[in-house]
UniProtKB/Swiss-Prot annotation:
Active site annotation, chain numbering: 247 (proton acceptor)
EC code(s) of this entry: 2.7.1.17
Gene: xylB
Binding residues annotated for substrate, in chain numbering: 84-85
Upper taxonomic lineage: Bacteria, Pseudomonadati, Pseudomonadota, Gammaproteobacteria, Pasteurellales
Descriptive protein name: Xylulose kinase
Length: 493
């Protein structure tokens, strides 16, 4: 038995994977609150994640007990997936010094611009790190905290990412792995080491060797759970914890995206598109994040900020649910009778427009209908990901199949839209919780249950009924709408 945990923005999910029956036998979920302000602030209390982990895991364990083969004492390992980039800072007593600023926080855009300038510009940053620092990365959050809370900053004793914090709670071990570390903005993704020069600029008062976690490779286990954790859940004290990783890295493992030629597209609050490579790509467009993977390779990735979150904006406005959104959108033609939406309700990362606002364009008295607005909103979210796929194609990253995860992937209408807009085959997985599944599989790998390729082939299964193929006539119509979207976008970037 293995446990997978996914600590996301909206909540924490837990699964129990039966490695003998080769299926998930328990699932649990607990919601997170989110602190927001109009200036781009997006924060959470780190202890909320611990509370949610406990709640979600207890639900999953209770469900798993319906299986005649299950006992908590049979659990062998745990793997943690966590939202990337969040800044967790602990004092000498291991208490958080401040709320965790999240990946979607754009309050630190100015600090990020200053950081890039001080380091010599984007080209110089890329030469130092193998990646361009974006506003959502951890580095600018650290700079912001130093400027706004200098007294508290001096008391920092540990700096962590969200999944590191949960690993620390489970094991007491202060460490991280290359995948999540590569989204910090002070990590060299090519050499796979902390970048002393960059960290010294961000935190000259702090000793990098003391406050940053030890780096481990992905197949290592970081240790076993603490005795009190074993008691809390009824586990034995030999349960191992794998290195875990960022949610995108764990999503890659959980979708079998561990070899070249496959792309994973996540349709969640934000949207991500990523593909595995065996070597770091040094000729990528700056908007592609050249992350490390959590299986000791690399994971070029594009992140856009407004996917299901933009749909929810319209759903709240029209007082409709997701089924009604889909139904209304299907009643409008491709292109929404000329309406284009730039859905940047939370700013945007790709292209880098952290302070921009959303726009609805092309309205007139004849096309201003609920149906057209619903269609335009879903199309616009899809177009933001198509923009990312175009960057992949320009960089020579070839994919034969896109594997969809996230809540948006449940819509057959949206899946077909994505297939048409991307002009690519798309498919979902039988197990919906890909990041949590990736965590459980990584824990099996770390515990010597087999090579990762074998484990992915054994435990990951495509949902053949979900496959969608591009409809050539619709591909052309969507291309026309996408080109109109690009024309409007060019006024901003």
């Amino acid at each position: 038995m293995y446990i997978g945990i996914d600590c996301g923005t909206q909540g924490t999910k837990a699964i129990v994977l039966d490695s003998v029956q080769k299926k998930v036998i328990g699932v649990g979920y607990a919601k997170h609150e989110l602190i927001t302000q109009s200036n781009g602030r997006r924060e959470q209390q780190p202890n909320w994640w611990i509370e949610a982990l406990q709640q979600a895991l207890q639900i999953a364990l209770k469900q798993a007990k319906n299986s005649p083969h299950f006992s908590p004492n049979l659990v062998k390992g745990i793997g943690i997936s966590g939202q990337q980039h969040g800044l967790v800072m602990l004092d000498k007593n291991d208490r958080p010094l401040y709320k965790a600023k999240l990946w979607c926080d754009t309050e630190t855009a100015t600090e990020n611009d200053i950081l890039i300038e001080k380091l010599g510009g984007q080209t110089a940053v890329f030469e130092k790190l193998g990646i361009i620092c974006q506003t959502g990365y951890t580095a600018s959050k650290l700079s912001w905290f130093r400027q706004n809370y200098p007294d508290k900053f001096a008391n920092i004793r540990k700096i962590m990412l969200p999944h590191d914090y949960l690993n620390y709670w489970l094991t007491g071990k202060f460490c991280t792995e290359f995948g999540d570390a590569s989204g910090s903005g002070y990590f060299d993704v090519v050499k796979r080491e902390w970048k002393r020069e960059v960290f010294k600029y961000l935190a000259p008062e702090l000793n990098m060797d003391e406050v940053l976690p030890k780096l481990l490779s992905a197949e290592q286990k970081i240790g076993v759970i603490k005795p009190e954790i074993a008691t809390l859940f009824g586990f034995n004290e030999n349960v191992i914890v794998s290195t875990g990783g960022g949610d995108n890295m764990m999503g890659a493992i959980g979708t079998g995206n561990i070899r070249e030629g496959i792309a994973t597209m996540s349709l969640g609050t934000s949207g991500t598109l990523y593909a595995y490579t065996q070597k770091p790509l040094l000729n990528l467009p700056p908007m592609i994040a050249n992350f490390c993977s959590s299986n000791n390779g690399w994971l070029p990735l594009v992140c856009v900020m407004n996917i299901t979150s933009s749909n929810k904006q319209l759903m709240n406005l029209l007082n409709i649910d997701i089924e009604e959104l889909n139904q209304l959108a299907q009643q409008a033609p491709i292109g929404a009778n000329g309406i284009t939406i730039l859905p940047f309700f939370n700013g945007e990362r790709v292209p880098p427009l952290p302070n921009t606002k959303a726009s609805i364009l092309g309205l007139d008295s004849s096309n201003f209908t609920r149906e057209n607005l619903c269609r335009a909103m879903m199309e616009s979210a899809t177009f933001t990901l198509r923009y990312g796929l175009d960057l992949f194609r320009q960089a020579g990253l070839k994919t034969s199949q896109i594997r969809l995860i996230g809540g948006g992937a449940k819509s057959s209408f949206w899946r077909q839209m994505i297939a048409d807009v991307m002009n690519s085959e798309v498919v979902c997985l039988q197990e919906e919780e890909a990041a949590a599944l990736g965590g459980a599989i990584q824990a099996m790998w770390a515990n010597g249950e087999g090579e990762l390729e074998f484990l992915c082939e054994t435990f990951i299964h495509l949902d053949e009924n979900s496959k969608a193929y591009p409809n050539l006539s619709q591909v052309k119509n969507y291309q026309n709408a996408y080109e109109r979207y690009l024309t409007h976008l060019s006024q901003l970037y």
